[in-house]
Amino acid sequence: ADTIALDAYRNAEKQCRQLLIDYEIKRENRVIDSDNTGSFFRFVNGKLSCKRGLGAINDDKGGVVTGDVERANLLNDYFTSMCVDDDGKTPAFDQVVSENLENIHFTPETVHAAIKQLKLGGAGGPDGFPPRVFKKLAVCIKDPLSLIFTSFMSVGQLPRDWKHAVVTPVYKSGAASSASNYRPISLTCVACKLMERVIVKQTLGFLRKHGVINAHQHGFLSGRSTTTNLLESVNDWTLAINDRKSVGAVYIDYKRAFDCVSHSKLLLKLRSYGISGQLFNWIANFLQNRTQQTRVGSSLSNITDLTSGVVQGSVIGPLLFVLFINDVACLFNDSSCVCKLYADDLKLYTVLESKVDCDKLQSKLNEICVWSDTWQLKISYKKCNFMYIGNTDCRVNMLLNDNVLQLVSDVKDLGVTVDAHLTFNKHIDQVVARAFIRSNLIHKCFVSRDVPTLLRAFLVYVRPVLEYASCVWSPYHVEQIKQIESVQKRFTKRLKGFETHDYKSRMSLLGIESLEIRRLKQDLIFTYKIVFGLVNNAASDLFTLTSSVNVNRTRGHAYKLFPHQNRIDVRKHFFSERVINTWNSLPAETKHFSSLPVFKRFLRDVDLRKINKTLIF
């Protein structure tokens, strides 16, 4: 009887395991068959992520908090403790724009356009209405919403519920038991976000018209990105090294900058930028009397008031912060020092030829400290760094409010590890190691051995790691090109049925390109954006058209670029130099350059190996 029962148990266990496998395969296929790339990424991220749920949190007294409500309250108290009390001072701030933007016009068309921008699978706010509801009912609700938004704008007020946020704590880095290592991401009402979206679009149009936002700010603005920020910086640095000079670069970190924005000081700046009337009143009301509570699991913390800051998770918050920090770049208008911003990520640098240049850099650091104190932004001195780029004999300590900056040989700059000699060796090692880990996890964690499933997971979860900001650091050494390519080579070789094919055959059968060719195409696409003014900042100075320097052009297209003579490899192989030969060798037909989508289709069909003979893969 025991033997019969054991056999029955084993058969039931086997059937149960098979049912679970079948269920998981169906679940994987259901997500894979959908066209929603975002949903697929979240699915893959959920399967492969090693992150665990929120664990125990240490309180101020050294105790350990484990309950959901207790952890929610502890985190919420920490987040609100970052708020600053206004010091009551009104700094001098000159009027920047003489014209005013007093009102925002809401029409059914502008509201409908805002609804279309919502992500179907996005999270809902405290009122429980997710974006899906608004998208499904867009045609029905666009008219009444436009009337509601117009009414709120005319009185300069918002409903109380729209000023409440439910915060999700997002782990950053460091000890997971410390509340300081979590970032608050606020979920606010979707209806309010729609209104904000219309406001932001029209406000940005006004600000661009009057040239308000500094050209060195790259955060949250169309045509600007982390890549444009990095390209402009590395361009300056490679030029200096090519001229046998060095660079001193300082990275400044602000502590919880978004949470520390003084409302009264922000409103002072908005007035000087021409924001007035009903719009000014609405923004003032948007900032005032805000509340939040933090969610852990299914539990919510107590509700607390927010006395400063702009909401992370709102639509208008990033723009308000950009305007608040905007004038810090004005400190460098008449200076040999250069400032680059990405939201609150600030770096400043200067070419060093003598100790006088070090003194000038120190002088600007002193001005940064005064500016930060005036506007009540706290500098996190321990996270600030100083790096010499290139070889120099001028080595001195740099100070921020009497704090000696840590001298480093490499630094993480907007996700790219930049070293003192601009080799990017460490960055390439890091991204390849990370990509291999993710690649191995895909083979390990997916139940299905289906090739399209695993390949799509690789394309959305691994390949972006190897391609982020590649225009900045794309390698030219054969060993590094092979090192990066090895990730895709090894992954495709492990796919079922592809073990015996060579790499070129595997790519052809799978319909993918080598990572080397993809980096070249990204170079060409970014060049197109710069040449045709789709990147609206100083990155446009990276190239010179041959037509503008009186160079005879007997063959080729009308957008050829002027090449330069360079002394060292890091300049010869920098983006704006390495791409020129390939760009100038593109076919002469101007139809290929009529628009960016047309140019991308052209690149999809052209064989770049026939144009660039140096390609390895």
Task: Describe every region a protein language model picked out.
Residues 1-66, 117, 441, 459-466, ...:
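Arg/Lys-enriched, amphipathic patches
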Residues 79, 125, 164-167, 183, ...:
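Catalytic palm active-site di-aspartate
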Residues 199-217, 300, 318-349:
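Active-site palm subdomain of RNA-directed nucleic acid polymerases
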Residues 403-472:
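Basic, alpha-helical interaction scaffolds
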